[in-house]
Amino acid sequence: MQIILLDKVVNLGNLGEIVKVKDGYARNFLIPSGRARRATEANKAEFEAKRAELEKAAAAKLAEAQAQGEKLGGTTVKLTQKAGVDGRLFGSVTNHDIAEELNKQGYKIAKSQVRLPSGPIKTVGDSTVSVALHTDVVVEVTVSVYGETA
């Protein structure tokens, strides 16, 4: 299916590009989430009429993400979990825990924006995680996990 992208989509294309994707991906994800429209002649004409407005909105989102990224960059998140004597946690620290703590600190972060490179954190100590604020803005955050004896 040919679609017009209304937003930048990772590994697919930028705003305004006409790309061919599988029907299910377009029908079940891209079109319902508002990231794309079918590439019919009517939709192409409508997109060209709104192109400047959509580009302005995309630039505003990017600027907002960059501003938040500058504030968030280098932040340290401190979490306390129950741990054994050897430094292994009973349970783990997930992206949900990190996003929750960042929200308590005043940042508006969804758990899907937190990227744990090697899965959940299962040991006491410092780890570096990525927070994807925008497709073009990825910030590194340090997570310090402290052990709490049971």
From Swiss-Prot:
* Pfam families to which the protein is assigned, alphabetical: Ribosomal_L9_C, Ribosomal_L9_N
Q: Has the keyword Ubl conjugation been applied to this entry? A: no
Q: Which SUPFAM superfamilies match?
A: L9 N-domain-like, Ribosomal protein L9 C-domain
Query: What top-level branch of life does the organism fall under?
Result: Bacteria
Q: Which GO terms describe its molecular function?
A: rRNA binding; structural constituent of ribosome
- What keyword terms does UniProt attach to this protein? Ribonucleoprotein, Ribosomal protein, RNA-binding, rRNA-binding
Gene Ontology terms, cellular component aspect? ribonucleoprotein complex; ribosome
What NCBIfam families has UniProt attached to this entry? L9
Described by its record, this protein's role is as follows: Binds to the 23S rRNA.
Family, per entry: Belongs to the bacterial ribosomal protein bL9 family.
Q: Which PANTHER family match?
A: 50S RIBOSOMAL PROTEIN L9
Its name, as the record gives it, is Large ribosomal subunit protein bL9
